[in-house]
Design a protein with these regions (language model features):
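Short acidic/histidine-rich active-site segments
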Residues: 111-133
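Short, conserved active-site loop motifs that form the nucleotide-linked donor/cofactor pocket
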Residues: 2, 85, 111-113
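Mid-to-C-terminal alpha-helical segments outside catalytic/metal-binding sites
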Residues: 135-169
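Short amphipathic alpha-helices and their capping/turn segments at secondary-structure boundaries
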Residues: 1, 99-110
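Short, acidic/turn-prone active-site loops that include or flank metal/cofactor-
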Residues: 71, 91-95, 119-120
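Active-site glycine- and acidic-residue-rich loops that bind
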Residues: 88-103
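Divalent metal-binding pocket/active-site signature
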Residues: 1-83, 103, 126-135, 150-153, ...
Length: 169
């Protein structure tokens, strides 16, 4: 059973593929997710404005949005809130130079939070630089719980409930 479309979106960081092709593909994936009434898992790198404009233009009641491995700005997160987007934190939030991202996640409503590993990349501290693995998600959960002033066990329940609401409701 298909439960989501993605990871898809826009990545203008390396300029490895034509922007227009990326945009067309992203729009097609949004249409498919809406038609199937399943979430779209969105990757956005160096493309906040374009990603937001496309999501806003294509937003409808059947479109459920998950911002995968979210590293966007606080203003980008704020723009996405009316679209009822979910935001997934990766190991990046544990990095000491991620203060802006930590601040952003501290303000995202609990009911819109998820956590992920993005294995084999982006290992959280204390495993930064090593190949990421699923067991390392506990460090991301601990950091996000700290940022949200919650017990880690409560954060895990919240993010599990959010996952189920997003993908199975």
């Amino acid at each position: 059973k298909i439960i989501g479309v993605g990871e898809t979106g826009l990545d203008f960081y390396y300029n490895n593929s034509d922007k227009d092709v990326q945009i067309e593909s992203f729009q097609n994936h949004i249409e498919a997710a809406s038609t199937l009434k399943i979430p779209i898992i969105v990757h956005s790198r160096s493309a906040e404005n374009e990603t937001y404009e496309i999501l806003k233009k294509n937003y409808n009641k059947d479109l459920k949005i998950l911002m995968h491995c979210f590293t966007g700005s606080s203003s980008f997160a704020t723009q996405l809130m009316p679209l009822e987007a979910y935001f997934s934190a990766s190991g990046i939030i544990t990095f000491k130079n991620s203060l802006d991202l930590q601040e952003t996640f501290s303000k995202i409503p609990n009911e819109k939070l998820l956590i992920e590993t993005d294995s084999p990349f982006l290992s959280p501290v204390p495993n930064r630089g090593k190949k990421n693995e699923p067991s390392f998600i506990k460090f991301t959960a601990e950091k996000l719980a700290q940022l949200k002033n919650m017990k880690t066990s409560d954060l895990i329940k919240v993010t599990t409930d959010n996952f189920n609401n997003l993908f199975f409701n």
